């Protein structure tokens, strides 16, 4: 089963209406559509699919927690398996945020590059940057139909995640807040011990060149607001500039982790939300864009019960 998102259809209908009819109709903002979504349009995120990173408190003593949702199968599972092992071994405890590059990424891991990795980490091949198409009957791939993609044949959503699609298959895309695996030059693909998150304009040129393993769903402000590094590529040059990481745990092994849920991308509510993101017709906007980059349709995520 496939669900297509009519990003252009409603704009065309609206353009054909008399001015008086258009003025008489009010269009909800994307946030209003999300707020009105039915309870069963929301999908719970399992605690076992959450990575909780606690940073050292800020200069005012306030705690800083970053919550990351890991990608579901079949995407990037070799690296995600490594991340689970690293978290279980408490490997990130005592490491740090080492790089903050403006309009690009925040990166964390072992700044010394000397800390021993736990045994049993997988070596994952670059072929796993892309997932071959699996049978249509096993998936719902909601396409943002009609909106061109500069980096792929098409794009859409599966299970709450933005994906691009080409002849070779499907792959996750570098939108704001996505989390990826740092690596050296090919054929190295990284273990998952060095991670980064996007804090700027979506660097889609990295798609299929680096493994994406998740996205920040809460607390990205604790990283995006950090002082920019002054070294090459935004690395911190002094040890005291680095932000200590107190702990990283899988959600069901961490304390005081709230429940999270995302708006199902195969729901009618999400289809309406995506259309509204592509064709803004609420009060502030005079000219609907008639389309949207996939990274401009962020999947709504909230604390359960909010």
Segments and roles (model prediction):
Residues 1-4:
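Positively charged n-region of N-terminal signal peptides that target proteins for export
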């Amino acid at each position: 089963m496939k669900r297509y998102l009519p990003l252009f259809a409603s704009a065309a209908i609206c353009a054909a209406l008399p001015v008086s009819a258009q003025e008489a109709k009010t269009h909800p903002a994307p946030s209003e559509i999300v707020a009105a979504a039915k309870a069963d349009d929301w999908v719970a995120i399992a605690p076992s699919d959450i990575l909780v990173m606690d940073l050292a408190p800020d200069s005012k003593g306030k705690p800083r927690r970053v919550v990351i949702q890991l990608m579901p199968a079949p995407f990037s599972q070799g690296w995600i398996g490594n991340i689970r092992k690293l978290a279980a071994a408490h490997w990130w405890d005592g490491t740090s945020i080492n790089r903050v590059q403006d309009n690009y990424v925040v990166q964390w891991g072992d700044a010394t590059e000397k800390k021993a990795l736990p045994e049993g980490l997988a070596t994952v091949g670059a072929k796993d940057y892309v997932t071959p198409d699996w049978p249509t009957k096993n998936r719902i791939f909601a396409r943002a139909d009609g909106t061109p993609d500069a980096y792929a044949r098409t794009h859409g959503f599966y299970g709450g995640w933005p994906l691009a699609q080409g002849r070779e298959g499907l792959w996750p895309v570098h939108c704001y807040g996505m989390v990826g695996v740092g690596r050296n030059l090919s054929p190295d693909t990284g273990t998952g011990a060095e991670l980064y998150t996007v804090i700027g304009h979506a660097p889609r040129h990295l798609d299929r060149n680096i493994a994406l393993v998740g996205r920040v769903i809460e607390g990205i402000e604790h990283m995006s607001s950090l002082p920019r590094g002054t070294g090459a590529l935004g690395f911190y040059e002094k040890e005291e500039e680095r932000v200590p990481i107190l702990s990283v745990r899988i959600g069901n092994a961490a304390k005081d982790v709230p429940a999270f849920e995302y708006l199902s991308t195969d729901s009618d509510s999400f289809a309406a939300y995506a259309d509204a993101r592509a064709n803004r017709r609420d009060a502030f906007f005079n000219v609907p864009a008639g389309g949207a980059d996939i990274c401009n349709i962020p999947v709504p995520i909230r604390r359960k019960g909010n």
